[in-house]
């Protein structure tokens, strides 16, 4: 089976690695052009490009797939199937028709739940107890194609977007190998998605990561884990932006008055306990703008805090602290 693989970030590279290990015939890899990244804004190759070069797989980096020239070039490879994983470019209908078996997508959710750009973050933020990988036949819609294979995994109470990403990337690689094996055997069954159950995972906006302390502690805890590693859940204190990276729910603390939300209840090297709309959070790891991530004990050694002080949103900050 002749395969074109299209993907860009680490999530896609792990799938490419699994396909390569399985000995499948990858005739071409597509990935986005090199982009400036990092503090020095130097041009960097994508993880998929690096891996393709490591395995000497032919590589193309088009800016778009809309041109007839690139479409004609893809057709010369006579692909049986194109595998797409977090590629980042739109696939025109003409491209979808090139492979004999069409284009198959590796999507990081249990479709039809969480179609769209940020399925991992949305599942975590909304408190889903499980997520998974859907192998989907691509069409012109946004993740609306028939599901060919689906595998689930639990979302653990300690999971962050980073840990969940890694679990799903590994699962995605295994799933696509399984799906292609079934396809080759003529045993891959497609199932249309139920539109009634569909919901969309909109792209994450930075402003969503600002903590509203009137929310309950369980939701704020999920925020902290959802926005790890990017952009980092943040709040404000004494004119400074503070990012929170790890916290624990303190359920035996009960605060019914909304004006208490964000107030520091106790200050302890083991954690800074802050009142929420319901229950409280013990902040274990935090970071001042421009600084390093610190445990509560390390932070307090250089930034003494006292019960009664309050974390709050930027709109409550007279000094107008900016986001980082």
UniProtKB/Swiss-Prot annotation:
Catalyzed reactions per annotation: L-methionyl-tRNA(fMet) + (6R)-10-formyltetrahydrofolate = N-formyl-L-methionyl-tRNA(fMet) + (6S)-5,6,7,8-tetrahydrofolate + H(+)
Disordered: region residues: 305-324
Family statement: Belongs to the Fmt family.
Recorded superkingdom: Bacteria
GO cellular component, one term: cytosol
One example GO MF annotation: methionyl-tRNA formyltransferase activity
Organism: Nitrosomonas europaea (strain ATCC 19718 / CIP 103999 / KCTC 2705 / NBRC 14298)
Stated name of the protein: Methionyl-tRNA formyltransferase
Function: Attaches a formyl group to the free amino group of methionyl-tRNA(fMet). The formyl group appears to play a dual role in the initiator identity of N-formylmethionyl-tRNA by promoting its recognition by IF2 and preventing the misappropriation of this tRNA by the elongation apparatus.
Annotated residues for binding of (6S)-5,6,7,8-tetrahydrofolate: 109-112
Record key words, sorted: Protein biosynthesis, Transferase
Keyword Transferase: yes
Enzyme Commission designation: 2.1.2.9
């Amino acid at each position: 089976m002749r395969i074109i693989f299209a993907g860009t970030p680490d999530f896609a590279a792990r799938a490419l690695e699994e396909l390569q290990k399985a000995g499948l015939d990858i005739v071409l890899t597509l990935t986005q052009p090199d982009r400036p990244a990092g503090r020095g804004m130097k041009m960097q190759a994508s993880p998929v490009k690096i891996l393709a070069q490591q395995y000497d797989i032919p590589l193309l980096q088009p800016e778009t797939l809309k041109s007839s020239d690139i479409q004609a070039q893809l057709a010369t490879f006579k692909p049986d199937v194109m595998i797409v994983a977090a590629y980042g470019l739109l696939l025109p209908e003409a491209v979808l028709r090139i492979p004999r078996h069409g284009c198959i997508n590796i999507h990081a959710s249990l479709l039809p739940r969480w179609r769209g750009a940020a399925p991992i973050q949305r599942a975590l933020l909304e408190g889903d107890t499980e997520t998974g990988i859907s192998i989907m036949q691509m069409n012109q819609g946004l993740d609306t194609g028939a599901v060919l294979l689906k595998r689930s995994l639990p979302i653990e109470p300690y999971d962050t977007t980073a840990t969940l990403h890694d679990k799903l990337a590994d699962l995605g690689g295994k799933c696509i190998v399984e799906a292609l094996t079934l396809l080759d055997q003529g045993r891959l069954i497609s199932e249309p998605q139920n539109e009634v159950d569909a919901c969309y995972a909109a792209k994450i906006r930075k402003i969503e990561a600002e903590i509203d302390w009137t929310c309950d502690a369980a939701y704020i805890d999920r925020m902290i884990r959802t926005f790890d590693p990017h952009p980092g859940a943040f709040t404000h204190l004494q004119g400074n932006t503070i990012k929170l990276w790890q916290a624990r729910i303190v359920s035996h603390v009960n605060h019914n008055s909304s004006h208490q939300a964000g107030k520091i209840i106790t200050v302890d090297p083991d954690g800074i306990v802050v009142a929420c709309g319901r229950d409280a959070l013990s902040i274990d790891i935090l970071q001042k703008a421009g600084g390093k991530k610190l445990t509560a004990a390390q932070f307090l050694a250089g930034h003494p805090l006292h019960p009664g002080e309050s974390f709050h949103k930027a709109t409550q900050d007279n000094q107008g602290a900016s986001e980082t």
